[in-house]
Amino acid sequence: MKAISSRTIVLASLVGFAVGGKIYTLNECVRGEGFYDSFNFENITDPTHGRVTYVNRTTAESLNLTYATSDTFILRADDTTVLGVNDTGRNSVRIRSNRWYHEHVVVFDIQHMPEGCGTWPAIWETKESDWPASGEIDILEGANNVVPNQSTLHTSHNCSMSNHTHQTGTFLTTNCDASVAYNVGCGVQHTRDNNSFGPGFNRIGGGWYAMERTLHYIKVWFWERDDPCVPLDVRTGAWIIDTEHWGIPAANFRNSTECDIRSHFGANNIIIDLTFCGDWAGNPAIYNASGCPLDCVTYVNNNPSAFTNAYFQISSMTVYE
C-alpha cells in the first residue's frame, strides 16, 4: 500500500508548561506520514543481537514494511522470506525520534502491536550514544506473546525501586542497574490486564499507552480501547492534559534514597522497533517456557507466514510538555 498523506502538527505557539508535574500542554502530535518526518530509520546492527536486519527508509517503503494513511502508520516485518543460515536476519524496522525529550508526557494510540513466537516489539526511550548513563524507559515491551506487558527502567549504578508504591502492576525486580543480573532492569508487569500485550491487545482493538516523566517519578498507564475509564483528554488528544486525574498507573517508578530520577535520566529519544529472538525473546529458557516450537532462530528462519500479524498500527503519538 502506498503512503498517501501525512499530518505532523507542532504547536510552536504553545510553550509547554507543567504545574506541580500534573498539567501539560500539547507540544507535538504525529499522525500518518508525519512519522516519516518525525523519526529516522535506523539501519543498524541490532544491539540486542536479534535475528533481524533493520532496513533504511527507502528499503522499508519499497518492501512495504512501512506505509501510512492520513491517520495511521504501519511498521512491520517481512513475512514472505525463508532465511538461510548465512542471512543476517528477517527484515524489519527500527525508528528513532528526531527530537530529544526531558520531562514530558507521551501518549500512543495503538490499534495493533506485533505478535508471534520469536517476536520482541518495543516502544521505549533512551539516548543510544550515552546508554545507560541517560537511562532507558521501556513503555511497551514483551516477547513471544507472553502476557502481560512489562514496563522497565534500565539505569547506571545505584538505582533501585521500592516495592511499596502506588501502582496496579507488580515489580518483578527492583534493581534498575543495567550492569546487574544481565541487564534485566527494574520491571513492572501490568498484572491487572493481560490484554495489555500480544494477541489479546489486538483482539480488543488495542488502546492507549501513556508515560509521564518528571524529576521525581516515571509513570506508565494503559487503557483498553473500550475502557470506560479512559480519560477524556487521552481519548481526544486534548491540547491540555491533567495526569492527576488519570487514575492509578500500571507502573510507578519513584524517587527514593535508593534512586534519584533526575541524575539517572537525561535527554532521550523515542524508539519504536520490532526484533526477533535476541537476548530476551531468543533466550532458550524464556523461549521454551513460552510454549513456542523448535528453537527461536530456526523458527524465525523457516516460518515467514507466522509473522503476518507482526506489525504496529499506530494512530498517533502525542507529546506534552
PLM regions and their residue ranges:
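GH16 jelly-roll
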Residues: 3, 21-321
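Cleavable N-terminal signal peptides of Sec/SRP-targeted secreted and luminal proteins
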Residues: 3-20
